[in-house]
């Protein structure tokens, strides 16, 4: 029996070293993935502003966390005395987000694979072929009749005592 080479990641995920640590990303994503592929980061200008606003111990919501391009640095910024609560409804992006948290040894993030809205239940999102070029973060749940069912929740149901900062990147 001859050994077969092991492919370390699925073909729709690549690994790069960013200024915040190693990050997995979908190289076919036209925005977040493309930015990681070319620069090793995404929207650094936004993160530069967050650094001026946030301090250790802060409670942060990352709504539309995608692969964690902001989640990882936000968690590092607020430190172990703070917490980031991250919401990402797309199952594949949520899995990459969780993998990036593990890769960067980030213990102060709670992730939820769900969308947020004004009611609780389920909604549908489009199903992507991650081997094809697309804006994977640019989905709309408005007029989707077919697709993958995902949980829909209300932020109020989390009964958070306080929130210091909300990063919101949703369609």
Report the location of each language-model feature.
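Phosphate/nucleotide-binding beta-alpha loop and adjacent structural elements of enzyme active sites
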Residues: 1-171
């Amino acid at each position: 029996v001859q050994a077969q080479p092991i492919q370390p990641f699925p073909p729709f995920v690549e690994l790069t070293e960013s200024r915040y640590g190693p990050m997995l990303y979908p190289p076919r994503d036209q925005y977040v993935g493309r930015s990681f592929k070319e620069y090793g980061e995404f929207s650094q200008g936004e993160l530069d502003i967050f650094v001026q606003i946030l301090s250790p111990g802060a409670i942060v919501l990352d709504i539309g966390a995608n692969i964690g391009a902001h989640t990882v640095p936000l968690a590092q910024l607020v430190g172990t005395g703070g917490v980031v609560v991250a919401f990402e409804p797309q199952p594949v992006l949520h899995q990459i987000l969780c993998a990036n948290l593990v890769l960067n040894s980030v213990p102060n993030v709670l992730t939820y694979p769900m969308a947020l809205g004004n009611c609780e239940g389920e909604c549908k999102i489009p199903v992507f072929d991650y081997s094809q070029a697309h804006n994977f973060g640019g989905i709309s749940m408005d007029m989707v009749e077919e697709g993958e069912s995902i949980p829909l929740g209300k932020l109020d149901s989390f009964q958070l005592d306080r929130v210091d900062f909300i990063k919101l990147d949703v369609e």
